């Protein structure tokens, strides 16, 4: 897996101050995507053990609320396979920090057997996330008043509450 950028002290992609990892590779190709260069799987730099260590160090200060995964597309199967062991490490090292993930796929697509994004890593990766921002960006539904998303079809799913209740629960800050 390659990544486009690591943003330290990001305040745009989740609550509080965060570290954000923008992965490379996306087959969704949303019209008016704000990072179309990340569609290419070979864009940016290789995600290496040294990259993981750098992110873990960036996450360590108390003022960092958590990690956000975006892209590109974290839920492309080849990206999930690399992200899963990394997210396990983050969760083990920082159990009180939140992990958010933005995806152009819907939560239902991620759960549907045979769908493009679903693979052997999907369920466990979802189990390690706190919030999933799901759905493709749709220019006609653009709404700049929304927090942490660009169009009104996208949802902020509280995955912890969703797991507890068995039905989709939306995040409220």
Describe each region flagged by the PLM.
Residues 124-127, 150:
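Short, conserved loop/helix-junction motifs that constitute active-site signature segments
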Residues 12, 108, 165:
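Flexible, glycine-rich phosphate/dinucleotide-binding loops
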Residues 130:
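Receiver (REC) domain switch/active-site residues of two-component response regulators
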Residues 86-91, 142-173:
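P-loop/Walker A phosphate-binding loop and immediately adjacent motor/lid segment at beta-alpha junctions
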Residues 2-29:
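N-terminal pre-triad scaffold of radical SAM enzymes
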Residues 75, 139-140:
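Glycine-rich nucleotide phosphate-binding loop and flanking beta-alpha elements
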Residues 1-4, 17, 35-115, 119-120, ...:
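Conserved Radical SAM active-site core
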């Amino acid at each position: 897996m390659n990544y486009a950028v690591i943003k330290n002290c990001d305040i745009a992609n989740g609550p509080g101050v965060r570290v954000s990892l923008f992965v490379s590779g996306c087959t969704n190709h949303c019209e008016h995507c704000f990072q179309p260069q990340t569609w290419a799987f070979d864009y940016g730099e290789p995600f290496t053990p040294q990259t993981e260590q750098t992110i873990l160090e960036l996450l360590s200060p108390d003022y960092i609320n958590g990690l956000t995964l975006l892209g590109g597309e974290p839920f492309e199967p080849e990206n999930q396979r690399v992200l899963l062991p990394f997210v396990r490490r983050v969760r083990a090292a920082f159990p009180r920090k939140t992990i958010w993930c933005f995806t152009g796929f819907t939560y239902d697509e991620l759960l549907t057997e045979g769908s493009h994004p679903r693979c052997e890593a999907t369920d466990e990766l979802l189990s390690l996330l706190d919030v999933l921002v799901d759905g493709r960006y749709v220019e006609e539904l653009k709404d700049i008043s929304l927090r942490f998303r660009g169009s009104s079809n996208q949802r902020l799913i509280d995955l912890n509450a969703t797991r507890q209740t068995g039905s989709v629960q939306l995040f409220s800050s």
